[in-house]
Amino acid sequence: MKSRIVILVFGFIAIFMSCTAKNGGGSFWLSDDLDTTTYYYSKINDTTYYLKFEKLCDTKAEGYFFVFSDDVYVNKENFVIESKGKNHIVKYRNNTVKTRIQCFVRENGLVVQYATFGKVLGIFNKLTWSEEINFKKYRKPTFVKYPARYKEKVFDKIEVKHDVVYGSAEGYWDSYPTETETYIEILTKGVLSTVSKKNLDLKMDIYYPVGDSLEKRPFIMFIHGGGFYIGDKKSEAMVEYCKYFAHMGYVTASVNYRLGFKPMGPSVERAGYRALQDIHAAMRFIVKNASVYGIDTDYLFAGGSSAGGVTSLNLAFMRNKNRPESTTKGLLYDDLGNIESSTNSIKAEFSLKAVINMWGAVNDLEILKNSQTSVISFHGDADKIVPIDYDYPFQDMKSQINTLILFKMYGSLPIHIKLKELGRREELHIFENAGHSLNVDEDNHLNENFKFICYKSRDFLYGEIFPESYKIKSIPMTLFHRAMPLYETNCKDYVKMFWDIEGGVIVGMKDNQVRVVWFENAHKHKLKLSILTDTGAGFYDEYEF
């Protein structure tokens, strides 16, 4: 009985080369309808067989078969079918069987019959034909790999809307480009400029890809550094960060904010708070005008260097309850108001998905409890401007003036220790023996660290758009036995999803799950996943063992 079942399975292959046995045709040929690139399968006596042939000639067919089961691995077993006149010789598993077969090729499969030989009156040959057996044609799943938007360059051209006004406020200045002056020289020159304030129109430059049909894109706001005293949205680093991410499909912006402070008391801290108020207003402006600029407000990010890093962190984590005492009304100072009360009157709520912190710091680690925002940081362990640990900024000032006008701050190291304790998604990159402004060289030109920061930030933000759960995982999950019959992705908000396999066969797909069988002796075992999400981005993952 077992031999008959196997004959049933293999016999149809030989018929691809023969005429109909019942009609007595003696010719053999290769059917043009035969698909040599895929499998044919049939369920016989509760067992499913998959067959595929690889070599064909006029009188001979060779291929392999496997039996589908609940086992993780299957063995491919070879077979050979030869035509002998009207009959066929099937060889498999060290068996040789003589039979006669007929087959009708259909678009979606095959209809097969086989015959057994007998004698009439012990003299004449008699053929007894089996019932028809239907073999379905295996349709290999289509596989399309989409461009990895947000991880690779997908747009050649970008455009910039310059000097978009997002608000106005009273301040000293909002732009102070400088390349050669030392910080002390700048502070000295700026003393006269802080005698009185004036109303400032605050602006941003918005970068976006050209030819993008997507209506809602993630947004990154970049904030320049300069100790809340100098800097400009057109600084080379901020411009290049904006361009880099815009080429990958983001909308980005480089923002100017109020700068300047009097070199006394808590003025520096108040300047940092004014910067936060302005940047908060800039983000409210973006949220209100999201449809104008094609921005997805579910994916808002901020990044900055030095003072810009400080402001990015405060934007994500500081709340009005955490306002520095110096920002409230005192004998010498007016109340600066709540975070969202300045610069423009837009009412809009938002939360940041992640922050790119480049050598920034915070005044209080407790503010990190206020948000689930993820953080990636870059910091030199020899930074004397914004120390990586808990210390006073500007340690290169003479006579320890910094201890008189500044407060100690928590650098990237304690920030990430705290984030790890809180279970936040975080990533810290420490540069050994490196000081401040890691992304430029001695001549103030962008260096290799700039590229490193771009690549690592790209991957980190990509992980926010495509969380770890999107990756292929086995069912059940296991760390040691990666070969499983079932796999899935937790991505539910997809437009299209495709699976592919090497070293096995996909035998079933449902929603976000796939069922496979692996060939035990395959040179490579790899499962591939490609997704087009509702964000318009392509996601790709491989599961290999």
Regions found by a protein language model. Give the residues of each.
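N-terminal glycine/threonine-rich, aromatic-flanked beta-hairpin/loop signature
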Residues: 44-83, 525-527
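N-terminal cap/lid segment of alpha/beta-hydrolase-fold proteins
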Residues: 138-215
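Short beta-strand element of the alpha/beta-hydrolase
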Residues: 215-226
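Short amphipathic alpha-helix adjacent to the substrate-entry channel of hydrolases
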Residues: 234-254
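Primarily recognizes the serine-hydrolase "nucleophile elbow" in alpha/beta-hydrolase
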Residues: 281-371
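Short beta-strand/loop motif that positions the catalytic acidic residue
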Residues: 377-379, 383
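C-terminal catalytic histidine-bearing segment of alpha/beta-hydrolase fold enzymes
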Residues: 409, 413-476
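Surface-exposed, flexible coil segments in extracellular/virion-facing regions
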Residues: 501-515
